[in-house]
């Protein structure tokens, strides 16, 4: 198998395993969120209220996927949509009291989950891995001249 193909396959497998592992660990720690829902709520904890468009940009997802994610966590009572006073066509996603109440416990458990995943890997290797991932992502950014 070509090295480039092997790398692409391994990145895909790692992404799938990350979602499966995180979902299982969230369930095990009684956090009623999918990994993507957790990431969205974590984004709101860190950034504050955001438009769905900004969330889509930050999470690298299309608007329809974000709408479904917001719908799901809104049904659970973690967020509400508030109409943007400056643009009636857009909504701002705001954490509810329930959404904010998860923060300390969920962040602590989230850090524990991630630390378990990285257990036994030296920090120098993790830093090299991050540098390589950054380069891969840069190479995969589509510019106007490539279209």
Question: Model-predicted segments: where are they?
Answer:
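The alpha-helix within a helix-turn-helix
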Residues: 56
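Charged, amphipathic alpha-helical coiled-coil/dimerization segments
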Residues: 71-131
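N-terminal leader segment of winged-helix/HTH proteins
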Residues: 1-29
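Residues within helix-turn-helix
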Residues: 52-53, 64, 71, 91
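Short capping segments at the starts of secondary-structure elements
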Residues: 47-51
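C-terminal regulatory/oligomerization modules of transcriptional regulators
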Residues: 1-2, 124-147
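Short alpha-helical "packing" element that flanks the helix-turn-helix/winged-helix DNA-binding module
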Residues: 40-41
């Amino acid at each position: 198998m070509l090295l480039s193909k092997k790398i692409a396959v391994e990145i895909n497998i790692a992404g799938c395993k990350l979602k499966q592992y995180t979902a299982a660990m969230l369930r095990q720690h009684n956090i009623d969120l999918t990994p993507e829902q957790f990431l969205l709520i974590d984004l709101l904890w860190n950034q504050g209220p955001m438009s769905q468009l900004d969330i889509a940009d930050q999470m690298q997802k299309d608007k329809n996927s974000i709408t479904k994610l917001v719908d799901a966590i809104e049904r659970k009572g973690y967020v509400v949509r508030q109409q943007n006073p400056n643009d009636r066509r857009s909504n701002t996603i705001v954490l509810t009291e329930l959404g904010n109440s998860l923060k300390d416990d969920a962040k602590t458990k989230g850090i524990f989950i991630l630390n378990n995943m990285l257990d036994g890997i030296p920090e120098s290797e993790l830093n090299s891995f991050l540098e390589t991932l950054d380069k891969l992502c840069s190479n995969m950014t589509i510019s106007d001249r490539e279209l």
